[in-house]
Amino acid sequence: MIKNPKVLILTAHYGNGHVQVAKTLEQTFRQKGIKDVIVCDLFGESHPVITDITKYLYLKSYTIGKELYRLFYYGVEKIYDKKIASWYANFGRKRLKLLLQAEKPDIVINTFPIIAVPELKKQTGISIPVYNVLTDFCVHKIWIHREVDRYFVATDHVKKVMVDIGVPAEQIVETGIPIRSSFELKINPDIIYNKYQLCKNKKILLIVAGAHGVLGSVKELCQSFMSVPDLQVVVVCGKNEALKQDLVGVQETNPDALKVFGYVENIDELFRVTSCMITKPGGITLSEAAALQVPVILYKPVPGQENENAMYFERKGAAVVIRDDSEVFAKTEALLQDDMKLLQMKEAMKSIYRPEPADHIVDTILEENHVEPNHIPIKSPALAQSFT
């Protein structure tokens, strides 16, 4: 039995999702009394210049580099076993060896497909349990390695795909993707309406624009949606200050019809009162939408994991996928007017959702390593406490 295990969580800053999952797992371990938890961006610390370049190319995949990213994602999938694995396995290895020697972790968790640890296990024979937490509703071969002890996946569909390509079923646990604990609390919606100055008798369209430019014509769309009766449009611009300033002028023409925000810390509050949401199909965003049963409109998914996520939610009836700019307004307006369709999408989201995935993952890891959790109560947010 390990009395006070040290946990190393490896991640990468490609989008915010992988890091957010790492932080959620870190918080969950700490809630259960495991204090020695380290989160490390292995690639960023090992090769900062290469990482910055690849992050730039990743962000460009939202605008000019979609075909390039398609070739990378699906091309690597086909040739990975033959040509890529040996190079990728050594990426970050020097930094990793120093990290393992200095910290001596008892458990290693990957929230990004980093195979340096399992490859090191294979080559040196070191004994350390390795867990991969997949952060999308699909699986790429780059996640899979014989020396990984267990995989935590979003759905039974992902598990079946992995079994089909040779991963033993007993090594795969369907838990859902870890999301922030705030998405699993109960909150009185009346307080949210008051906080954001929203009318509870009107439908709400939430557009999560963010820094990467989910929509190319947000301003024009907002102007069109503002003419729809009994509709409020809420736009979250994230850290895109230029977009926010551009929309503030539009908001001033009719502040009751359009609300513009920058970065919203407690974005779950807006998820709770929205009728549907336009967003990009990241695995964490979709998991959060499923937790709160928010119908989603997925705009122009980037080829690769985002497209795979979008197709899964579309097949399940939880999302409308739009691939053409000219269809955004008409299809969104039609959905907002179709209460039966919205209800069906909410039910589909409910069927996808897996409750408390972070707890499930952490409890499984602690149990397998014979650690008795010591739960530390965490104070709930004020809005959650006000639920009646």
UniProtKB/Swiss-Prot annotation:
The top of its lineage is: Bacteria, Bacillati, Bacillota, Bacilli, Bacillales
Report the family membership. Belongs to the glycosyltransferase 28 family. UgtP subfamily.
Localization recorded for this chain is: Cell membrane
The Gene Ontology terms for molecular function here are: 1,2-diacylglycerol 3-glucosyltransferase activity
Keyword annotations: Carbohydrate metabolism, Cell membrane, Glycosyltransferase, Lipid biosynthesis, Lipid metabolism, Membrane, Transferase
Instruction: Return the SUPFAM superfamilies for the record.
Output: UDP-Glycosyltransferase/glycogen phosphorylase (SSF53756)
According to its UniProt record, in which pathway does this protein act? Glycolipid metabolism; diglucosyl-diacylglycerol biosynthesis
Origin superkingdom: Bacteria
Organism, as annotated: Bacillus thuringiensis (strain Al Hakam)
Q: Which reaction does it catalyse?
A: a 1,2-diacyl-3-O-(beta-D-glucopyranosyl)-sn-glycerol + UDP-alpha-D-glucose = a 1,2-diacyl-3-O-(beta-D-Glc-(1->6)-beta-D-Glc)-sn-glycerol + UDP + H(+); a 1,2-diacyl-3-O-(beta-D-Glc-(1->6)-beta-D-Glc)-sn-glycerol + UDP-alpha-D-glucose = a 1,2-diacyl-3-O-(beta-D-Glc-(1->6)-beta-D-Glc-(1->6)-beta-D-Glc)-sn-glycerol + UDP + H(+); a 1,2-diacyl-sn-glycerol + UDP-alpha-D-glucose = a 1,2-diacyl-3-O-(beta-D-glucopyranosyl)-sn-glycerol + UDP + H(+)
What gene codes for this chain? ugtP
- UniProt-listed PANTHER family: MONOGALACTOSYLDIACYLGLYCEROL SYNTHASE (PTHR43025), MONOGALACTOSYLDIACYLGLYCEROL SYNTHASE 1, CHLOROPLASTIC (PTHR43025:SF3)
Annotated protein name in UniProt: Processive diacylglycerol beta-glucosyltransferase
